[in-house]
Every structure is written in structure tokens, then in C-alpha cells.
Amino acid sequence: MKKLLLGIAAACLAGFTFAQDAPLWMRHSVISPDGTTIAFTYKGDIYTVPVAGGRAMQITTNPAYDTAPVWSPDSKRIAFASDRMGSLDVYIVAKDGGEPRRLTTHSGSETPLAFTDAGHVLFSAGIMPSAEAVVFPSNGQFNQVYRVSVEGGRPTMISSMPMECISINKEGAMLYQDKKGYEDYWRKHHVSPIARDIWMYTPGKEPQYRQLTTFGGEDREPVWAPDGKTFYYLSEENGSFNIYRRTPGDAKAVQLTHYTKNPVRYLSAATDGRLCYGFDGEIYTLLPGGEAQKVNISIVSDRNDKDIIRQIKSSGATEMAVSPDGKEVAFVLRGDVYVTSVEYKTTKQITNTPCQERTVDFAPDGRTLVYASERGGLWQLYTSTIVRKDEKLFTYATELKEERLTNSDAASFQPQYSPDGKEIAFLENRSTIRVINLKTKDVRTVMDGKYQYSYSDGDQWFQWSPDSKWILSDYIGVGGWNNKDVVLLNADGKGEMVNLTESGYNDGNAKWVLGGKAMIWTSDRAGYRSHGSWGAEDDTYIMFFDAEAYDRFLMNKEETALLEEAEKAEKEKAGKKDEKDAKKKKEDADKDKEKKVEPLKFDLANRFDRIVRLTVNSSHMADAMLSAKGDKLYYLSVFEDGYDLWEHNLKENVTKVLLKKVGAGALQPDKEGKNIFLCARDGMKKIEIEGSKISPIEFEAFFDYRPYGEREYIFDHIWQQVNDKFYVADLQGTDWNGYKETYKRFLPYINNNYDFAEMLSEMLGELNGSHTGARYYASGAALPTAALGVFYDEAYAGDGLKIKEIIAQSPLTKKKTDVKPGCIIEKVDGVAIKAGADYFPLLEGKAGRKVILSVYDPVTGKRFEETLKPISYGAQNELLYKRWVENCRKKVDEYSGGRIAYIHIKGMDSPSFRKIYSDLLSESSRKKEAVVVDTCLLYT
């Protein structure tokens, strides 16, 4: 599948030049304090423009993403965030451009918030809370606020509590928006306990925090008015985000703008009272008592992106299909279909679109491929056929013909050829099984969609019978969406559906075996189940539809050998008789060539008496297949580290590992059953069963990467997914068609994944639904900053780092050491830590590596060295979480006088459930009169 966050079609770019007189999607706009200039982000760079409008000046030109500009009080410099070192760091640059100076070096993400004065910048980062903080320790969700000099150096913590969108008046009082919990930042219209409010922080000997707004929805982005007494902010109090004015302590607010559809964003104010804000992708200003004025901007800049980038790829296949002769495999790579030789790297590109193709299948004659493609926002079926009769293989074909197979207004995908090649079954609207006759193009329904439930595309399974008259499918029946069964369907769409398994457990992935006389399927009826979440271990079972086949399957090795000898003798006898009649021999040869398949007959009345469990151990299985003779089961299972290929000899009852760590995927045998093909995360493979030999299937695929085209496709894909699958049919009254047009027009002005993710989140935010939004994360710093697992004394201003507390289970607690709170770390690997100097570079890339700390103990006057292995910040955050839980437990115990227990639910997963189950029912908890269940979830 096309990876989230990439492009719009080149045709869409033809309508404008790179001297853009009306650019859109200008974000993070902020007016300078002197009111003369506006800085903003456009296409990943920082620009400035006169407040009256005109030609914008490009301040940064680095290929990295630059964002979030903040003006210095004297309007001479701009601080901004950039990922030019792999993660977002804070930089500062002159207002007219030049070489920026890097101010922060930690490998996390740092974003500037405001200047405290001309010499210091406040920024947000999730580095380390204070030892006294009660804020829930999450990975980057509840950041601290730090101050750093414009010359760089060691950051100083200002607040361990999250403070977003800070504005500071002349007296030093800070306005900020709070953060109470996790929700997508761009979600709109929600009224909930975690909606943001405006607060005021007054520093001093006795710092004061005062809540200024109480609306149950979102209040954001406060900025002081020039008088330092009143302030402006954004609120959804009357529908969409608009600008309001309020005085601290006054319950009434004055609404200044009255937009009804799109939100106002990025509010800022100059010392002359002029406001600046973003709306509908453009920038506006507003003078007190006046009317809003759009800032007309033109941008002239070089273009550093391309409509199409030619690439050659040798990895990345996500699915595959094996040709009938086993000489080729069709596969999907980044949404395009290819065919490659099994033995050679030669590769033929079948499709070349910025859209997504998937679920490819070969016709029985090997000359046609069928696949699904989401073109124009709608999944439909397409075929590609070898035109020249003298060409037998797709890999070397010189002429192909693509045709659209379905022409409906319903999503159609997951096509599968019938064994006789006359029809194709597919899914319509994700759960209805339909069949199209390739000769007449008539389409019929085999199973109504109400009998299946699809959570995500591709989660449904069905398979044709060998005689092309029946289909096995997953099935939920009535009210069984969480307990799938296997159903037998008549492919003509008539007759009664038969629930073959009728189980309260999950049964699925059924496959025809033994020529259609039986099926194998997976079931979790015997496996260990997750104690507190989804999932269970599976087994493979076989069900026989034929009594004779069942009896034969139960024969031991000796009985089977005797039967096969008898059948061989009978066949040889029949063959000698046929040789006497040459004409009959030719007729029989022709019949063999046709390989006519006899219609299947089913004895279903006794099917439950003919079920055999094939696997000896329940496990987490990826797939399974039965040999053609039915004497061996092959399956992919994980017991330790990675998926292994197992073989279970059913006649000898011997189980062994054929190959270790082959990966997870679908097992696809060739026609003779001698080889297994597998598409795993690490590539496509051919496995020769005899000898357990595995060979990579290599390819060289030409790929046309179209960044703009892919972004347009992904936009349409996401819009359609919501339209098809949102949990309420009316989309909560959202004008979804209208918003598609609103946001799609921004695509030509977006050239990077950060902006694209933000734009998608803005559109999805219109739904007012939780768990929505798009994400893009930078690659991260090449050398992540390591952690020592200690709290430092923020009040200490001398050389080195003074330890305030050593966190339990951190590196310094795992060995006998003289290091204790109060000690000062003077050097790291021999490099001295000077007062005010940035020490993070000394720990770059050192997690898990031995580091020598030079330590001074002021109490004893002793200096000594300590060797340890620092941990990652992720590992340190886990220790902080455990410390936080223990502190909460102690507080509850203290405040209740030991009468109330405390447990915390870490996440929505099985380990978290097991933890609370153990803690809640432990003897210490059972002695309590009540329990506090804390449900603040740790998102990782």
C-alpha cells in the first residue's frame, strides 16, 4: 500500500507557476512585535512578508522541514523548529535570513514557544519532568517548558507542567493553554474534560496559576493585548474557532470574528494592537475596531521537488501470487503490480499509477492477471492480459492489454479466479461476496454482506472449490461478529448456506484439500486465550466431507502403503488393457489433458464426527497448508523469536522445524506441491520442501515515484474510507463532500509529509471523532541521546550535573556504587561539563554502551569514576512511569489511612489487564475497603 503521506498529480500543477500570487496553506503565521512583518511557514520553509502584503522573502532554504517561527521582542530575530538533524530542534536566525544557529541538541523534538527577552527562548520538549512533578509521564504527550540562551547552552526547566502557546506581558505574566490529556490537536467541536482552557501563570516567590476560561470546549492560543491587561484568544464557544477578547477575571468575552465554517488558527498580536491569524490557508490581519484584511502574498522561489522520480526497487513487495506453472510471481510493490521470474531478476511492470493496486491473482492459463485498483476514489477490478499468442510469460511479454472488469459505484476488490477460469469471485462493499461471469459479464451475489463484518480492508477470506461450484468463506451469521465460523456457499448464489463449524470460538481461513473432499481451517478453540484483551492461540483442523477420504486419512503408515500398492497395481493393469486399443489410448490422453474435475458431493450430516486436530501444539500461526496426499501439514508459527516453518508428519506423528525465521505470510504451493512460495516482510521466497532449501525471489522493478500524485491519491483514499466506514452514517452532520473540496484545493501547495499530515488532520478533525488524524514522524536523530536515569538539581548552577534523585531500577541502582544524591557528575568519558554548558552531546548514541562518569562527592570530598551503560529515553520513561504509579499508591494509602488501595491501568492491552488483575485481587488489596482505579492511559 502507498505509505501514508505522499503527493498531487502533475496535471494539477500545470495551472500555476512558481511565482505564486495567491499561495495557500501558509501556516504558523506570526506578526512581529513592531507590527511590520509577518513570518510564516510555507512548503517547509520560513518566509516573511510585510504586514501590508507583497512579495514574501524566503528566510530558510534548507531541504529539511522548518516550522513554528517565533519573533524576538525586538523583531530582529526569529526562532524556529527544524528537523535538519533528524528530529525537531530549535534554531535562531536573523529576520533577513542567513545561517541559523542551533540552540537545542537533544534527540527528542523541541519546538519554540516564545522569547522571555531578547536573549532567551522558551521551548517545549519531553526531556525529563522534575522530581516533584505529578504530571503523568508519557512519551512526548505532556512536555515540559525550558529556557535556552540565544547563544545555545544548557536548557533550564521553567515548568514541568505542559504549557502551550505561551504569551508573556511586560510584567512577566504568562498566558498559556493547558493540556489535560491526549486528543488530536486538530479535532474540532468537541466538548470534553480534556478540552483546553486558558490559564495565567504569574512567576515569583509564590507562583500563581489562575484559570481564565471555563468553556467546556476548546479555548486556545492566548495573546496579550498591548496594555498587558486584556488578552485575545481563540474559542469554539459559538461553533467554529473565532477570535475573542477578554479581561482576566471577567466572565464575559467579546467575539471579534464570526467565521462559520473553517477555523481561525495561529493568533498573534503586535505592540500596536494589530492581530494576525491564519484562515482557510491564508493570512489575515485585524486592527481593533476594524475589519479583517487578507494579506495578499506572492512567493517567488526555486522549486526543490519533482513531479516524478524514477527509481529502481529491489525490495518492498507486500503481497504476491504464484503463476500456474510456478515460473513467475506477480507481486504488489508500493501500490503497483509487477511480475518477475522466479529464477531471474527480470521484472515486468504491469501497472504504473499513483493510485493503489492490490490483491492480484493469475488466471488458470497464466495469461491474464486480475487485481483491484482504487482509481478515482473507487475500488474496481481490472485485468491485464498478454496480447501476443507466441508470448507465454508476463515477465517477457512485449504487449499487455488492461481492461476494467467491473463498472459499479460500489467498492470491489479481492478478486479470485475460479479454477476453471470462467468466473471471478470478489468482495463488494468489503463484505458481500459476488461472482462475475467473464463471458457474459453478469454479476451475481453469493453471500450478502450482512453475514460478514469487515474492520479493515483485506480481513475477509474466501476460496473457490476445485470444481468451481462452491466457495468456503468466513461467516458471522446473526450477531456473531466476534465469533467467526466457516460457511459453505453455492457459487451460483442459490441454495442454502451451510455453517460448517457452528462454534462459539473463532474459526476461519478455510482451505479446500484432498481434491475438495475435506477442508482445513484454523480455530482458537483449544488455544490459550488472552486474559484481558483480543487474541488467542490457534490450531489447524481438518473436516471431511467424504467418509471414504476420512477413513483413508485415519490409516496408519503401513495401511496406507498397502492401499497405495493395490491402487498402483490396478492402475498398471488398466493401462495394459488400454494399450491394446490405440484409439482409446488417444482418447484417454485427451481426457487427461482436459483434466475434467468431477463435481463435488458432500456428506455434511456427519461432518462433526469427522474433525481431526492436525497441530500438536496451539500457537500463534500465520498460515498452514496440507500436502496434496494429505500426509503432511506445513505451517508458520512463532514460539520464540520469529515465525518458523514447521512440518508435521501425520502418518508418523512427528513434528519438526523445517526452516527458522522465514517470516509471516501466506503459504502458496505450486501445482505439484513441491515448492512453497512466501511473501514475508523481508522479501519473497521460494522454499523447496524436499531438502528444506530456501531461495530469495529477487527482482529489479522500475518505479515512478509521484509525490504529488500519491498525496492526491491518499487524500481521496482517506476521504472515501471515512465516507464508507465512519461509525455513524450521517457523519455527525458533517458536510463531508463540502470539506473534500475545501481541503483538496490545498494539495498543490503542499510538498512535504508534515504539512500533508496536518492538512489531513484538519479535515478529519471536522468529524469531531476520537482516534482520528494523520501522523508523520521524522526519521529521528542518527545518534539518540542516552539517559542516566537520574533527576538533576535544577537549582544547581556550578560545573557538572548535581544528582537530586536516582530512579529505581536505573543503571546506577543495578550495581554497588558510591554515587548517591548530592554527588556531582563532573565528566562524561573524560569531557568536562562546564556550568551552563549543554551536556546532551556527551550522551549521543551511548545507550547500551559503556560510559565512564567522573563523580565528585561534596560530602566526603572524594572524586572517583563509575562505569555504567546508559539507557534510552524510552527505557527511562518506563522507569518514570513505575515511579509515578508507586508515588500515587503511597499518596492514596497516606490520605486514606491505609483503607483504600490504588491500581493504575497502563494501557488497553493484555499485559495491563494481567497487572491490574494481579494487583486488584492480591491479598494487600483485598484487605482494603475500596480501590481507586486510575485510567490515565500511557500511549506508546
Describe each region flagged by the PLM.
Residues 20-26, 54-56, 301-317, 398-404, ...:
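A short helix->beta-strand "capping" segment at the edge of beta-propeller domains
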Residues 748-798, 862-866, 871-887:
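Extended, small/polar residue-biased N-terminal targeting/export presequences
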Residues 30-35, 69-77, 113-120, 166-174, ...:
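Blade-terminus and WD-like Trp-Asp/Gly-His loop motifs, strongest in beta-propeller folds
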Residues 20-23, 41-47, 60-66, 79-91, ...:
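A flexible loop/linker signature enriched in serine peptidases of the S9 family
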Residues 804, 831-938:
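Cleft-lining beta-strand/loop regions that shape enzyme active-site pockets
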Residues 1-21:
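Bacterial Sec-dependent N-terminal signal peptides
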Residues 783-836, 910:
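PDZ/PDZ-like domain segments forming the peptide/carboxylate-binding groove
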Residues 21-47, 316-335, 615-631:
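Beta-strand-rich domains and repeat architectures in extracellular enzymes and scaffolds
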